[in-house]
Amino acid sequence: MTGEQEWVQPSGVWATAVGVARVRALESEREDALFRDPLAQAFAAAGGLWPSSPPLPDDEAARRRRLAVAFSIVVRTKFLDDLLEHATASGVRQVVLLGAGMDSRAFRMAWPEGTRLFEVDTPAPLEFKASVLRQERAVAHCERITVAVDLREDWPSALAAAGHDAAIPTAWIGEGLLIYLPEDAVELLLARIGEQSASGSRMGLTLGSRGVIERFAAGAVPGSAASMWVSEMPDDPVGWLAGHGWEASCHTLRERAVAYGRPMSTLPQHEDGPGGLISAVRR
């Protein structure tokens, strides 16, 4: 990165993607990192969050909530990395990242030959991201296709126009996305995904856990990620997704953290983090 580069500063919901990049950059510096994201620091720096960031709040409860959110980002990233590896091992060669933000999986993961990865997001984050990628001379490890469209619009048509083939299996990722959408928008999104999913498609989602808005968003600073959360997971996420044509499994952040050798020992049970993790197969 050079000091001469002028970046369009992130704003609104997509600005939270830069905060996610900062968390991934910090994780990547650990000796026991659950993943390595060599581009995360560049994204965070371009967004003004590296090397400095907003200080932790003085309030102990708020501090724990901030740490819980960061922890959840690390765990969900590893979870979805594994899901994509399993999907491609099963023969899936199309990947769609919905609300892609600063996701760098096209660049940091190994992909089988012939994999096409579509990044769907609004123009502003995609343009910001493209500037950083050019600066870093980043080279994707698969065919990477960006689709500039708002998910509130007719994104399936835009995705099809970009080359997505609904007749063959797709791995769909909705990471840190649904929690920002009202329930009717979540239902529409799931219906549209289903319409574009051949049998054998995979899906990975993160959902806001029950009570997350009360626990995390109620006292959130305006403009912060938590201040924009509006939806939580249904009481029966597996049954809910079955109604959309998916055979799903639901995992807690604490459960996955233990499996990854990173137990959440410093957090009380009621402060596990803001969400649950879903893996699903289209039948």
Swiss-Prot record:
**Coiled coil spans:** none
Name its GO BP terms in alphabetical order: methylation
Binding of S-adenosyl-L-methionine, residues: 121, 150-151
Metal-binding recorded as keyword: no
Entry's EC annotation: 2.1.1.-
Pfam families this protein is in? LCM
Q: What InterPro entries does the entry give?
A: Ppm1/Ppm2/Tcmp, SAM-dependent_MTases_sf, SAM_mthyl_Trfase_ML2640-like
Spell out where the chain crosses the membrane: none
MF (Gene Ontology): methyltransferase activity
Going by the UniProt record, its keywords in alphabetical order are:
Methyltransferase, S-adenosyl-L-methionine, Transferase
Q: Where is this region: Disordered?
A: 264-283
Q: Would you identify the family this protein belongs to, as annotated? A: Belongs to the UPF0677 family.
Function, as annotated, reads: Exhibits S-adenosyl-L-methionine-dependent methyltransferase activity.
PANTHER family in alphabetical order: S-ADENOSYL-L-METHIONINE-DEPENDENT METHYLTRANSFERASE YKTD-RELATED, S-ADENOSYL-L-METHIONINE-DEPENDENT METHYLTRANSFERASES SUPERFAMILY PROTEIN
This chain's protein is named: Putative S-adenosyl-L-methionine-dependent methyltransferase SCO7813
